Amino acid sequence: MTFRVAVIPGDGIGPELYEGSKRIIAKLIEKYNLDIDLIEVEAGDVALNKYGEALPRHTLDVIEKADMILKGPVGETAMDVVVKLRQMYDMYANIRPAKSLPNVQSKYPNVDLVIVRENTEDLYKGFEFVTSTGVTIAIKVTTEFASKRIVNVALNYALMRRRKVTCVHKANVMRVTDGLFASVCREILKGKVNFEEMYVDAAAANLVRDPTRFDVIVTSNVYGDILSDEASQIAGSLGLAPSANIGDRKSMFEPVHGAAFDIAGKGIANPTAFLLSVSMMLSRMYELSKENKYILASKSLENAIIETYKSGNKLTEDVGGSAKLKDMVDEIYKYM
């Protein structure tokens, strides 16, 4: 099968990240004979100014026919783009790896964990009300269906990794909603992996104390949103973190960092998070096709990034180097 990928270059540094990464993606396609068709589309602040919509109809038409979305950072319209696409295509699993890179200053040089976050429910469902002057209410939604779905995703990740899952919740206080999530975790995970439960406040503390104790963390939407940013920063920098939004019908891959308008056009942006998102996309292609060439390409790209950091010769300013975006891309290309 040929994977059709809708590419949203985005705003700020987004277009130059994609432009700089094109030769690496082309090299992977050529070297591993990958069946990938990349289609550039417009979305974000630029699209809003041009068409009056952050996600114009012609963009949605292309995305509808695509298998995956590769997205650069967008600016003020991020919610209009990211949240809308997540909802439209039921991208229920947010996957956030947090992994240390060589020569990146961090208290912990050996962090390697994945946070699997439920992406459709919880307080982020958006059910908020003003009941009277000075009084507001939000509804926290937890269903057995969504809980089982995300816990099974976490199980699959754990079986490919170190076979440990930490279920993070606050069932001692949220006894009904988090209680349901915790019971689903026990039902699915006990006996299949090294399983533990942890209250979210303890998890936040333990990530700071010793992040190496974690392998796969599975949790609900709000807790996952907070913990994943914490974990990325502990591993080195939020600016180096990739992410995936996985759905059965369509998935989206994007760097966690923002559009960084202050450095846009200067050629000094770090391509790491964008390229690691490409690696995650290739891994998803392997999951769907079962063709080894996609996972080989994914690992090749990740290893080239790691080797670039090991050498330390061509790193951008944000990670202590003096290289330009093009220099770092050339170095990654060399290690491929």
Swiss-Prot record:
Site positions for Important for catalysis: 124, 170
Binding-site positions, NAD(+): 258-270
Annotated cofactor note: Binds 1 Mg(2+) or Mn(2+) ion per subunit.
Subcellular location: Cytoplasm
Enzyme class, first EC level, given as a word: oxidoreductase
Entry-linked SUPFAM superfamilies: Isocitrate/Isopropylmalate dehydrogenase-like
Annotated InterPro entries: IsoCit/isopropylmalate_DH_CS, IsoPropMal-DH-like_dom, LEU3_arc
Pfam families to which the protein is assigned, alphabetical: Iso_dh (PF00180)
GO CC entries: cytoplasm
Domain of life: Archaea
Gene Ontology MF, one: 3-isopropylmalate dehydrogenase activity
GO biological process: isocitrate metabolic process; L-leucine biosynthetic process
Requisite cofactors: Mg(2+); Mn(2+)
Record-listed Mg(2+) binding positions: 201, 225, 229
UniProt KW keywords: Amino-acid biosynthesis, Branched-chain amino acid biosynthesis, Cytoplasm, Leucine biosynthesis, Magnesium, Manganese, Metal-binding, NAD, Oxidoreductase
Chain residues that bind substrate: 86, 96, 117, 201
This protein's pathway: Amino-acid biosynthesis; L-leucine biosynthesis; L-leucine from 3-methyl-2-oxobutanoate: step 3/4
Job of this protein: Catalyzes the oxidation of 3-carboxy-2-hydroxy-4-methylpentanoate (3-isopropylmalate) to 3-carboxy-4-methyl-2-oxopentanoate. The product decarboxylates to 4-methyl-2 oxopentanoate.
Entry-linked NCBIfam families: LEU3_arch
Family assignment from sequence similarity: Belongs to the isocitrate and isopropylmalate dehydrogenases family.
Subunit structure comment from the entry: Homotetramer.
Protein's name according to its UniProt entry: 3-isopropylmalate dehydrogenase
Species of origin: Saccharolobus solfataricus (strain ATCC 35092 / DSM 1617 / JCM 11322 / P2) (Sulfolobus solfataricus)
